[in-house]
Amino acid sequence: QVTPQMVQKQLKQTPDIRTVVITSPTYDGVVSDIQSIADTVHAYGIPLIVDEAHGAHFGFSPEFPENATRLGADAVIMSVHKTLPAFTQTALLHLCSDRIAEKKVAQFLGIYETSSPSYLLMAGIEKSLQIIEKDREMLFAAYSRRLAEFRDKTKNLKTLQVLQPSDFSKQEAFSFDPGKLLILTGNSMSGQALQEILLQEYGLQMEMASGNYVVAMTSIMDTDEGFARLSDALECIDGTVHKKEEISEISPREIYREQKTVMTIDQALDAEQKTVRLEEAAGAVSGDYVYLYPPGIPILVPGEAIDVQTAETIRHCIRLGLEVEGLP
């Protein structure tokens, strides 16, 4: 999570910061203390923008965290297609205060957005919001029940483990999205291996696989049958696997380190390039983006120096079976 103390430290160290942008919830469902962060940011007279792409369903039920539009954020971006019944590509930008000029936002939307928007997609957003407005209580009550029943049914797994929101300390997460199912492999296999078994043998597609866990996305549109299929599959897999030697996991902090910028992105892309082996890359400058997908956050950006630790981190991700994009 991002804490108010982290934000305060950065604002003190870099007084020319004009805007603070944070992601909450994260891809894994970790939620930061938006209200306290907003208070910290506003004390410096600047706005807070929250990337709440995975939190479009927040604020509709007491079983879920509040959404950032009600917690002091000045602008909030929600991908309604991720967790609400809307078409892929659809999202909402909320302007919540006058710290961000609406006229300026409209001006840049006119520059960056298409001049031929899809009315099908826009109508899909409206329909999604109508569904929420009409049946919110029923949908979220059923959703919360399904999640609770799933976690209760899978709590006695011997090797695999479905994380409970209570498993996170306040240092790790201010809050947690119960709709994200984090399934740990218990060092019985890699997350990638578990994802493959669930897909190939049970027809269940996970959202993401990491070193020793997978993430399952759920929503108000999931059914009792869908949750039962996943819990039954996990019980079957759990009965056939056992803990092995420790799998060397790698944390997001190790993967997404701050890198030294040697030249701008356009300079790096236009420069003469050559391909080298990863173990020989330390000391070179990246000529392309290197990232794990999902979620697509860059490990390296063109123009950044490649040090020994970063090269080894990329090699370790490959050994774990993670999807590393951007390598030749």
Language model feature labels by segment:
Residues Q1-S166, T185:
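Conserved PLP-enzyme active-site core in the AAT-like
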Residues D152-G326:
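Conserved C-terminal alpha-helix-loop-beta "cap" of PLP-dependent enzymes
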